[in-house]
Amino acid sequence: MALSHSLGFPRIGRDRELKKALEAHWKGELDEAGLRAVGQRLRAEHWQLQKDAGIDLLPVGDFAWYDQVLAHSLAFDVIPERFRPAAGKPTLDTLFAMARGAVANKSGGSCCGGAHAQEMTKWFDTNYHYLVPEFSADQQFALSWEQLFEEVAEAHALGHSVKPVLIGPLTYLWLGKEKGSDFDRLDLLERLLPVYGEIFQRLAAQGVEWVQIDEPILVLDLPQAWKNAFERAYNLIQREPCKKLIATYFGGLEDNLGLAANLPVDGLHIDLVRAPEQYPTILDRLPAYKVLSLGMVNGRNVWRCDLEKVLELLRHAHERLGERLWVAPSCSLLHSPVDLEREDQLDAELKSWLAFAVQKCQEVALLGRALEAPDDASVQAALEQSRVVRAARAASTRIHKPEVQARLAAIRPRHAQRQSPFAERIAQQRECLQLPLLPTTTIGSFPQTSAIRLARQSFKQGKLSAAEYTEAMHAEIRHAVEVQENLGLDVLVHGEAERNDMVEYFAEQLDGYAFTRFGWVQSYGSRCVKPAVIVGDLGRPQAMTVEWIKYAQGLTDKPMKGMLTGPVTMLMWSFPREDVSREVQARQLALAIRDEVVDLEAAGIRIIQIDEAAFREGLPLRQAAWQGYLDWATEAFRLAASGVRDETQIHTHMCYSEFNDVIESIAAMDADVITIETSRSDMELLEAFERFAYPNEIGPGVYDIHSPRVPDSAEMAGLLRKAARRIPLERLWVNPDCGLKTRAWPETEAALVNMVAAARQLRAELA
């Protein structure tokens, strides 16, 4: 039979139980025993959900308290000295300190002396974030975290057939960074492999037959030294007990296909959603003894699978492989919401088009059954339902809109170009804005308090009238403006109290989007996002932000930034359509945002920020495909931004990003000011400016908003001095790394006091 399995399952829970438990624990409202009980209950529920869906081999080790890469760092004892316990093995407090920075806890204790958090960055080209391992030249590895073995025991006690999931040694090293002296982290491989050996020995002793080893870097452009290291590593790993399935996903193997096919392991998983073209070659080149796991159901989207189309390929594979064929989602279902059945308010038509993690498991299991029992009545009924749904979706009037198509067809190159070059624009902007040297600002959002969330919820439930809700939001805006005035910030924001999410807020006001109530996915730690779903052609029926920003500007003589989310980020942080290209969807969004930008300018707003936090996230994993993406992504931004006069200043913001290799394309966006995340990486991003003279203004973030830790002004001033060595003072801005939505007011004000003080200190020093 064709075995069905899952590469991983969402860990947050159908109702975000893990998020709530983590935050209660961090506030001192839930002790460690209570937190662990929630985790154990969720794991049991998730295994049962997958088993009930028909999955034969369940993943174990996909659960993590914060992040799976961080869990591996603890397992391997890769703990930076600033977090290392004085005695004994690491604890959950150690893990959370590494993730969030070390702060005093609510019960009065503290960990790690106020150490700053580890760097966080995007997991390949997804919107999930992982904690970057920090390696030292004298790095030693030791098995120091028992979580995987405890969870295998839990699953076995519940009677499940399990497949532990490990991040492979090459991918783990690739994801990390060297700290301190000059060395190559690949040289650490031989020290790391014995720990993997110990893990396999322990798992074999627990009765484990198969282990999934995730090596997604096999879909990247790998240096030859890393390719050689794969052969070296797996020649050693093959000696260890347990059968081993190498899992690749997020792209095609391409030039690494021969390497992956011939590694001395027992099976290989490939992603045929992202890279269907690799199927014939891998089928021909896979050794006759190996299992081939085909990722046929999209683990990163919410659309139902085209069962008939997928089954056609699987039948061919089944004829060739027989019992060596396994069926799976394309990747871990971490990137999918948990269960569509929780959605009790979606219209029936849209709901029939969707599938979340539970339903994707059902699809995987159905495909396996269809190979073994094609005439089974339940299989035939499911295939017929799939046909009906796809036909209905293709014919639906909510998808195609002639007026949007007409606007797209009318786009010309001049529509994506400002009136004058930056040098001319900036002179007019400086005359208009009259800002000091090193102007201070924030990225946009201020803390979303419980009062704000309650007001929004009450308004949605009809408990507050529109007028009452507007006044509640006006009060929040007044507070935000007053705080900023008192702090002495130079360019203000209205705080975004009225916005539930930087994408969903706009998506709710655009035609072509749909929304779920429980479509949450994990972004990092306890942070969950609920991506909107792009269903059809996109357009803006009316202004979205103008009245809020006008109100805020009326409260101050200082410039008030209009705050918008850019077309690429709107696309990347939504679940996109599958029937048209990302480029087309980005252009539709750009036209909608362009209309809003023009309306803000007409309302007297002199600075408009178009956030492109996800710009680099959209970059293809293979460099050969970069330029095509960068061309349409930069054009979409310019299309959104270029409808204004020269004296209107366009800002953009990008976060969690390594831009050294795409700095020219960022310059091609031609934003007047760009603010970027740099503090966690100690201004490492600014190395790009040593070889590329970035022409416009830039605000490198001077403190990390993802941690509750408040850095002092001296620390921020130190980062500014580093920045000033690479960026001319007259083009340097001072700002946090990102928006302040997830922080509390006391730490927000404390950090901004220090930030303004640092800017004033640098003005005095360097002016």
Swiss-Prot record:
Alphabetized InterPro entries for the sequence: Cbl-indep_Met_Synth_N, Cobalamin-indep_Met_synthase, Met_Synth_C/arc, UROD/MetE-like_sf
Residue positions binding L-methionine: I443, G444, S445, E496, D611
UniProt entry tagged with the keyword Repeat: yes
Positions contributing to 5-methyltetrahydropteroyltri-L-glutamate binding: R16, E17, L18, K19, K122, R527, C528, W573, E617
Residues annotated as the enzyme's active site: H706
SUPFAM superfamilies: UROD/MetE-like
Gene3D superfamilies recorded: 3.20.20.210
Stated name of the protein: 5-methyltetrahydropteroyltriglutamate--homocysteine methyltransferase
Reactions mediated catalytically: 5-methyltetrahydropteroyltri-L-glutamate + L-homocysteine = tetrahydropteroyltri-L-glutamate + L-methionine
Disulfide cysteine pairs (residue numbers): none
Pfam entry (one): Meth_synt_2
NCBIfam families named in the record: met_syn_B12ind (TIGR01371), PRK05222.1 (NF003556)
UniProt-annotated binding residues for L-homocysteine: I443, G444, S445, E496, D611
Statement: the UniProt record of this protein carries the keyword Metal-binding: yes
Residues reported to bind Zn(2+): H653, C655, E677, C738
